[in-house]
Amino acid sequence: MIRRNRQMNRQPLPIIWQRIIFDPLSYIHPQRLQIAPEMIVRPAARAAANELILAAWRLKNGEKECIQNSLTQLWLRQWRRLPQVAYLLGCHKLRADLARQGALLGLPDWAQAFLAMHQGTSLSVCNKAPNHRFLLSVGYAQLNALNEFLPESLAQRFPLLFPPFIEEALKQDAVEMSILLLALQYAQKYPNTVPAFAC
């Protein structure tokens, strides 16, 4: 997965765009679609599975949509890292709750290192220590608040990177761009997957 991220990051943006738009099977979260890998080995079977996903989720095909704005280009380049970025953003936003209740120690090492690197401030918002699902949901909601600046077809596909429970995430204000860029840079330098127990 990490090697695939690096390869995708170097491709021209129109190629990345086409892959995201027409090959959701390459990134859809496994809890959203359970299909045996051997069933989609042949190109025709893979194409049919992608068509089913496009139809089932009523995904637009992105015709005539512009990929020139900087946020869209950032999303395209970092597409596969967005779940890790969301988790980091959730940790950052809830750092006061994590610190106060000793839950920092329960985070993966890479998330602890991210929080140690950036000493921002946050207010306590939880009565109890936030769990991994909640951290992912909060980060997802911060990223999702930026969807209005993305082409509709890309915004439609964004939730597919995450487990289904994410759609119940409460609305959040959009993440500050400086924190987003910091999380993206960190995820690019130290790629990791979101803990399985958060999904």
Swiss-Prot record:
Keywords per UniProt: Virulence
Domain of life: Bacteria
Residue ranges that the Swiss-Prot or TrEMBL entry lists as coiled coil: none
Pfam families (alphabetical): OrgA_MxiK
InterPro entries per the UniProt record, alphabetical: T3SS_OrgA/MxiK
Purpose of the protein: Oxygen-regulated protein required for bacterial internalization.
NCBIfam families: OrgA_MxiK (TIGR02555), PRK15323.1 (NF011851)
Protein name: Oxygen-regulated invasion protein OrgA
Source organism: Salmonella typhimurium (strain SL1344)
Gene transcribed to yield this protein: orgA
